[in-house]
Design a protein with these regions (language model features):
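Short, low-structural-confidence N-terminal segments
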Residues: 1-53, 139-169
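Residues at structural and domain junctions
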Residues: 6, 26, 58, 119-120
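Generic N-terminal initiation segments characterized by hydrophobic and/or small/turn-forming residues
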Residues: 8, 12-14, 59, 106-113, ...
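N-terminal targeting/tethering segments
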Residues: 21-110
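A C-terminal, polar beta->alpha supersecondary segment
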Residues: 25, 65, 69, 73-74, ...
Length: 169
């Protein structure tokens, strides 16, 4: 293989793997707001004490939660971190879980607030209009996802395989 071809392959791999390279430690950057891999990892661990989640799902929720929470606030059904902490305390008590509510991360509380808001949004009469507003706002987000997590398309972080990796038949 020629030296220039090898250099081109290495450069392509570096560019592909370097998504979020300007933000070291980032799982994603959303409209300039960095979501760190440590935030995703911690929220995943904390949420797995309640139910089963994976890092991609957690990252997806952290990307879209601000949009949902903002829309919920506009509808008068916004949820706060304090409400999420109270909800978590109730869940812990009902399920006899030993959680230190004072150390739960803001990311986990944001995801719980997001979930609470979504549940109330489902009860609204005009959910079609709301859904369209949410889709439009989410589509307008400038999202850069670390390739370790995949890519953000259609409001979900999904696994991707770089085109330079050949899949087995």
């Amino acid at each position: 293989m020629r030296k220039s071809a090898i250099v081109a392959i290495v450069l392509a791999a570096a560019l592909t793997l370097g998504g979020c390279a300007s933000h070291p430690g980032a799982a994603a950057v959303v409209d300039g707001r960095t979501i760190s891999t440590s935030t995703v990892d911690r929220a995943t661990r904390e949420l797995n004490e309640l139910f089963t989640v994976d890092p991609r799902g957690v990252l997806t929720m952290l990307i879209v939660a601000p949009v949902y929470l903002d829309e919920a606030s506009g509808l008068g059904i916004g949820k706060s971190r304090e409400e999420a902490r109270d909800y978590l305390a109730d869940v812990a008590q009902v399920n006899d879980l030993d959680l230190d509510l004072d150390t739960v991360s803001d990311a986990t509380l944001d995801i719980l607030a997001f979930d609470m808001a979504v549940q109330e949004m489902r009860l609204l009469i005009d959910t079609e209009d709301l859904g369209e507003r949410l889709r439009t706002r989410i589509d307008a987000l400038d999202v850069e996802v670390n390739p370790r997590f995949g890519s953000f398309e259609g409001s979900v972080v999904s696994a991707t395989t770089p085109e330079w990796i050949v899949q087995a038949p």
